[in-house]
Design a protein with these regions (language model features):
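A structural signal for multi-pass alpha-helical bundles of membrane permease subunits
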Residues: 1-195
């Protein structure tokens, strides 16, 4: 889901940043409007759609609603707008078209932005609770967050198991952050100097 979001966001953001087409501002405003709508508002329609497609209790049902993110499109668009025009002019002189420029120049320069976006999306998707609880019916399909919640049953609370589960649940987020920390710092410092 994270890889797909980064790819879709990159392609959409590049179109919004570099191309002129009818209703561009209106469409981008609609993309931004999706970031203002809480996920809980559309959960019923998402569930009915997933149910009608026969994707409940499947990995596709878990992943499909989170394939496109307005926040990711916005972040990548802002990055593409900040790229100096000289890069595109030099690539055009060297014979690159739009796709060549995107894949050979803009995307390699965007690695810190990709890393920051991927870490943000990983934490957001990995920590989902309500959607996986709603879509899955078998324990084998449920996420670790739901498993930890199921450790609390009635009057019995086994704190040792809950804390062990919490430690296991937090490890992937910590590892992703540690591995991507250099890229996050590069991304933050890249926007600090204008010139």
């Amino acid at each position: 889901a994270i890889f797909a979001q980064v790819i879709f966001a990159t392609l959409a953001a590049y179109a919004f940043a570099c191309f002129e087409f009818p209703f561009k501002k209106l469409l981008f405003s609609l993309v931004l409007a999706t970031t203002m709508v809480p996920g809980e508002v559309v959960v019923v329609t998402n569930y009915l759609t997933i149910q009608n497609m026969g994707l409940t209790n499947s990995y596709a049902g878990l992943v499909l609603p989170s394939l496109i993110s307005g926040t990711a499109i916005f972040l990548m668009r802002q990055y593409f707008l900040a790229l100096p025009k000289e890069y595109k002019e030099a690539a055009t002189i060297d014979g690159c078209g739009e796709i060549g420029y995107l894949f050979r120049v803009a995307m390699p320069l965007a690695v810190p932005t990709f890393a920051s976006l991927a870490i943000y999306l990983f934490v957001q998707i990995y920590n989902q609770f309500f959607w996986p609880l709603l879509v899955t019916h078998e324990n084998a399909m449920r996420t670790i967050q739901i498993g930890i919640a199921f450790l609390v049953t009635g009057d019995v609370i086994s704190f040792g198991q809950i804390l062990a589960g919490a430690m296991i649940a937090i490890l992937p987020s910590v590892l992703v952050y540690i591995l991507g920390q250099d890229y996050i710092i590069q991304g933050m410092t890249a926007g600090g100097i204008k010139g």
